[in-house]
Amino acid sequence: MLILTRRVGETLMIGDEVSVTVLGVKGNQVRIGVDAPKDIAVHREEIYQRIQHERTIQSQMQHLEQGSFAPSFDDEDYFNR
């Protein structure tokens, strides 16, 4: 993990197209602005995790509807816990 120190108003670049600017600091909260192309999704981590979880459930539901769902786990790993 890269650790950077920035002050209010300072920006960091991610690649050529994404910039992250520190807009303010109040107590233990940091307000940032992200400027990215529309084709790059930007989410808070908890929202991203929820989206991934919902996609997994949706995929499993599609497999159930198609009758091709089978639980997947490695027998050896499961029984060697």
Swiss-Prot record:
PANTHER family cross-referenced by the UniProt entry: CARBON STORAGE REGULATOR (PTHR34984:SF1)
UniProt subunit comment: Homodimer; the beta-strands of each monomer intercalate to form a hydrophobic core, while the alpha-helices form wings that extend away from the core.
Species this chain originates from: Psychrobacter arcticus (strain DSM 17307 / VKM B-2377 / 273-4)
Function (record text): A key translational regulator that binds mRNA to regulate translation initiation and/or mRNA stability. Mediates global changes in gene expression, shifting from rapid growth to stress survival by linking envelope stress, the stringent response and the catabolite repression systems. Usually binds in the 5'-UTR; binding at or near the Shine-Dalgarno sequence prevents ribosome-binding, repressing translation, binding elsewhere in the 5'-UTR can activate translation and/or stabilize the mRNA. Its function is antagonized by small RNA(s).
NCBIfam families: csrA (TIGR00202), PRK01712.1 (NF002469)
UniProt xrefs under Pfam families: CsrA (PF02599)
Lineage: Bacteria, Pseudomonadati, Pseudomonadota, Gammaproteobacteria, Moraxellales
Source organism superkingdom: Bacteria
Record bears the keyword Transport: no
The family this protein is said to belong to: Belongs to the CsrA/RsmA family.
Alphabetized GO MF terms: mRNA 5'-UTR binding
Compartments in which it is found: Cytoplasm
GO BP terms: mRNA catabolic process; negative regulation of translational initiation; positive regulation of translational initiation; regulation of carbohydrate metabolic process
Region (Disordered): 60-81
GO cellular-component term (any): cytosol
Keywords: Activator, Cytoplasm, Repressor, RNA-binding, Translation regulation
Annotated S-S bridges: none
Name used for this protein in its record: Translational regulator CsrA
Gene3D superfamilies on file: Translational regulator CsrA
